[in-house]
Structures are given as structure tokens and as C-alpha cells.
Amino acid sequence: MSAEPSGDPFVREMLAAALPCTLTSLDADGCPYSVVVWCALHGDRFTVNAGDGHWLANLRRDPRVSLAIVDTENILRHVAVQGTVVAIEPDPDYEHIDSLSQAYEGRRYQYSLPEDEPRFRVTIEPDRIRTLDFAPPGEAIR
């Protein structure tokens, strides 16, 4: 599949469902490091939000990432993204994390305050996207 997710209805459907995303970065020794994050689509780029921790340090050092978005009702429906971090920007007013929290939890982000924990909007340019939608029409596979 091309790396233009906004043109793919399945990718848009999966993101609109507010499914957990697994982001994998690379540690300094090359080992994969995975975390579960909230993600969104902005144009043809994916965005996630991060505190100033281990995996954000990984992204600053090596911008290669993968994202896996899996339907929690049917694991045979998923999106796999290989991409490159193209921007890491401060989210000083929590505008970005609040929008993700609204999508995933139906409320503003409540786990920290801007003055206590800086947050960062991470933008990922997809290089390759693969999808699997293995469900008979009108049926869920469990």
C-alpha cells in the first residue's frame, strides 16, 4: 500500500476507533523498545504525544519507528506503519495531548499538568503502510 494514509478508508476507520497504538523505537544498542500510545492522523502524517522520557530520547537519536494499530475485537484487522519522525515539538499548553485524550477517553488529559511535566507532539512521516482486514463482511472474527 502507498504511504498516504488519509486516502485509505481502513486506516481512517482504525484511527477513528481510538484503538491503542504500539510505537516501537530503537534503543542505543539497536534493541527494539515498544510502548503503547494514543495516535492520530493529521493529513498524511501520524502524531503521538510523549513525555520527556526514554522512548522520546530514542526518537531524538534515531528517528526510525514503527506503529502497530490493532483492532482489539479482531486482531486480524490491523495497520502496520514503518516511518520516520520528522518533528518533535513542545506541547506547552497540552493542546495536542488534550485532543488525543478527548478521542481516547472523552475528556481532557488528566495525568499531569503542563507546569509539572513537559509534553511533546511527535510527527511521523509514514514510509510504508501495510494493512490486514480479515473479517467476512458483516462479521467479526473472535
Question: What feature does the model see in each segment?
Answer:
Residues M1-P5, L76-R142:
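Charged, gly/pro-rich active-site loop segments
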Residues S2-T22:
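Short, basic/aromatic recognition patches
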Residues A18-G51, L67-I69, H78-A80:
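Short beta-strand segments
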Residues P20, R64, P126:
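ATP/adenylate-binding site constellation spanning eukaryotic-like Ser/Thr protein kinases
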Residues H54:
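Short alpha-helical
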Residues D62, L67-V70, N74:
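Conserved short loop/helix modules at catalytic or binding sites
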